[in-house]
């Protein structure tokens, strides 16, 4: 039989079809997925690519404009210029060199935004340094760049509402693409009617009927695919509607799997015959409450404690879900509350919740999340409420779990409330250090300090009732840490009633208890330093000074821990400020000298790390030092410290330099001030002072000339008031004190410098010259005469100071200075000669023989000469 009749028709007999084997076309062994069939490759032109790049950058610039991010806008504008340069060939070819309208629109909008921001002077002053610099640079670059598009920009400003060219083209192209993508609906072919095969004699009729109905389908299949299997024609075909339903079900199933993996589905009930969709809620996925106990179990305190032990046993393990553990503990506490199992059990469960909250943060060095910290405060506050409400309830770490009493009073629960409080306070400090100190977030976090202080007060009540003296000392020290750096204006009032308790009285009570009952030196040391700091903050100079001298902390503080050393540095800095406010300049300089001469007061006060010293420490050391930093609201103004130090050094150093001008052995009192003064004197041209340090140096040079008015104007002016003096308590008194001290020290400098010119000086003239009371001038001159700083005598009837000529003139002083230097040179040469021996000797004698015999004689001559010179100096 020919192969063209292999497929045959229904009209042929079965015997003829069985004689020849049917040759079938091989079926393909691969299939195409629906995604591959639906995906179409899109070919874009160069114009579309370049324009899409420009539109993306313009979109980012608009986002930067919304948030007023000038730095990012500048970077995006520079990127836009580069992108337009790359698109220039396309613009030249497609647009005849005319810039597209959407690009011109972006330039105009950016220019209007920059001009508006530049004209708002107040808002521009409030910008950060980086944003202000970026705004200036962006304005200059934009003005320069838009000069090439002046014609297009002017045309755009005439009719800005006209739509962009690319938008019209996009809309037209999208319409065309939609028209092209509309499928041509074909007329559906009628499906063959299928019915079950008839019995016996009806079989031949049925086969004839089927063949007549399927001739057209066979012919179409043969044309498309060649040969086909006859059996496939009788299989039930899937209609288009059923196929669409299958695709929809498949898409829904895939979407469900994706949502389940991302955790966005709230709940889905699955049954044998299918499931139902539920509403998706915002936020994290929620789950059913964990089942604690069986339905029929009798819940009592022992069962709850057993369940608590099972939950706590997983604490600290590697794969423990901390969030799930917290949920279990909360559910367990709810169950105990529903069954009314007692407040002691509630206290134990809350203690476990607090411990779990502390464990939730895996890294101890990182700050806790604010929401979890708030939960900590709430739970600890509830614990304190329970303890204050039940006097027969004790929470202590000395109680063993076997000895706990949770059902019958007196209740005994294992735990340590004071440890929880200390951890809570430390986490609060970490939260403050993590925030930007110049943001509103820091202010919001700082408001929680009131909650922490109130909680510490309540914990102190519990500890005073049930705790040991050492625990009371720990609680009081936490209260002191939140109290010592705060200024209380009531404490400086003189009309305050004696019954009202100020912070000074509170500090006195807390510190005295620690002095008497502390068993460790650390708590006592920190209490003393905090007490000194608080006294100095309220200008109690003598109390603070006496407490420091009696404690001898300056001798042992170098052996303390770093946090105590930081507190010592802060205390000395504040003590120096207190001494300066009280007019004790020498004491202020002594307190601040060791801190400021190191050149790194910022690090010593734990107020930040210097970037230029990063190579001196490793990453671990830097991490540790950052953990020791103080919160921003506890910082001491470094510029204020430096100004006080420089002014104190000026008031001490300038009169001393005038008194010992020709002394070769003169020592420097303040090395830092001396270096700044020498650097200023070496400059050929000295401009007007700008910084605080330049003001102090200019004032020192004016005082050295005796011009006290210029000196006072350099120290006290509007700029210095805003930067320094207005930051002090009692700024007006400080400025008045500065004026008095500058006049007095200028008078002393004048007398030291020009005393050799006068035979006598009128005290009344000096008082008028320096605008000081005559009694004060008389006191200063008398003190200088008594201290042998000024060789003179006072004539009371004439109110004059008679100067004596016993001191050498300038020429004599220079000659004496030269003689001292020559004598030192001779001594040094003789020592070198003695050390080298007779190696410089010429002659026939052996090396070293003659000089070795002469050495004792030479040493005796040198000693005699030195003794004679010392005697002459003593006689002078």
UniProtKB/Swiss-Prot annotation:
Stored Gene3D superfamilies: 1.25.40.570
Keywords: Cytoplasm, Initiation factor, Protein biosynthesis
Comp. bias intervals (Basic and acidic residues): 154-172, 182-192, 848-861
InterPro entries, per the entry: EIF3C (IPR027516), EIF3C_N_dom (IPR008905), PCI_dom (IPR000717), WH_DNA-bd_sf (IPR036390)
Subcellular localization, as worded in the UniProt entry: Cytoplasm
Domain PCI residue range list: 632-808
Gene Ontology CC, one term: eukaryotic translation initiation factor 3 complex
GO BP annotations, alphabetical order: formation of cytoplasmic translation initiation complex
Region of interest (Disordered), ranges: 1-25, 154-233, 839-876
Coiled coil spans: none
Pfam families: eIF-3c_N, PCI
A GO molecular-function annotation: translation initiation factor activity
Extent of Acidic residues compositional bias: 11-20
Compositional bias ranges of the Low complexity kind: 206-219
Chief subcellular location: cytoplasm
Subunit composition and interactions: Component of the eukaryotic translation initiation factor 3 (eIF-3) complex.
Role, per record: Component of the eukaryotic translation initiation factor 3 (eIF-3) complex, which is involved in protein synthesis of a specialized repertoire of mRNAs and, together with other initiation factors, stimulates binding of mRNA and methionyl-tRNAi to the 40S ribosome. The eIF-3 complex specifically targets and initiates translation of a subset of mRNAs involved in cell proliferation.
Family indicated by similarity: Belongs to the eIF-3 subunit C family.
Protein name: Eukaryotic translation initiation factor 3 subunit C
Protein's gene: eIF3-S8
